[in-house]
C-alpha cells in the first residue's frame, strides 16, 4: 500500500503525535509528480506546522521503509524526509528513521532530502537519529537537509548520503 503523507500540502499537520515507542514498518511513499511546478513534501508526515506559541510535536517513534520521488520534469520546490518532509515550529524527539530516501534528478535538484527530515525551520530535534540511506542529485543530508533557526541535541546519522550531481 502506498502511503499518503499526514499533513499533505497545503493541509499541514499542526497537532501532537506520540508514537509511544512503537515502530512503523514497511512505510512506502512512491511518488510521481502529477503537474509541473507542483510542490513536493513527502515522508510519514508531509508538512508539519505549529506556531511560535504552540509548536507541533512528533515524538517516540521509529519508522522503517522507503520514500522515493520521481518526475518527468523539474518540480518547483519541496522537501523529502523519512519521517517529516517539511516542518516549521515543531518539536521532534525520540525519533529514529530507518527509511531509504531517494529522488530522481528532476526532483532532487529542487527538493531538500534528509533521512529523518527534509527542511526544518524553527524546530527542535532532541535524541533523534537517521539510520537510512539518502540518495539523489544534490541538496542532501543525513538527519535533515536543512535546519534553519533551530537546535539539534543528541542526534546522530549512520546512514549513507550519496549525491550524483555537481554544482
Model-derived segments and their meaning:
Residues 1-167:
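Surface-exposed repetitive/solenoidal architectures
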Amino acid at each position: 500500500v502506498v502511503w499518503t503523507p499526514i499533513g499533505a500540502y497545503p493541509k499541514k499537520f499542526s497537532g501532537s503525535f506520540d508514537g509511544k515507542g512503537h515502530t512503523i514498518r514497511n512505510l512506502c511513499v512512491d511518488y510521481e509528480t502529477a503537474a509541473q511546478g507542483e510542490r513536493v513534501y513527502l515522508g510519514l508526515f508531509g508538512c508539519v506546522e505549529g506556531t511560535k506559541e504552540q509548536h507541533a510535536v512528533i515524538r517516540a517513534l521509529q519508522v522503517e521503509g522507503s520514500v522515493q520521488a520521481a518526475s518527468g520534469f523539474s518540480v518547483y520546490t519541496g522537501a523529502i524526509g523519512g519521517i517529516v518532509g517539511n516542518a516549521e515550529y515543531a518539536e521532534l524527539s525520540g525519533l529514529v528513521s530507518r527509511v531509504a530516501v531517494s529522488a530522481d534528478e528532476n526532483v532532487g535538484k529542487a527538493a531538500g532530502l534528509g533521512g529523518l527530515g527534509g527542511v526544518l525551520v524553527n524546530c527542535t530535534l532532541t535524541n533523534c537519529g537517521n539510520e537510512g540511506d539518502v540518495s539523489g542529485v544534490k541538496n542532501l543530508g543525513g538527519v535533515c537537509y536543512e535546519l534553519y533557526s533551530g537546535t539539534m541535541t543528541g542526534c546522530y546519522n549512520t546512514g549513507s548520503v550519496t549525491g550524483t550531481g555537481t554544482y
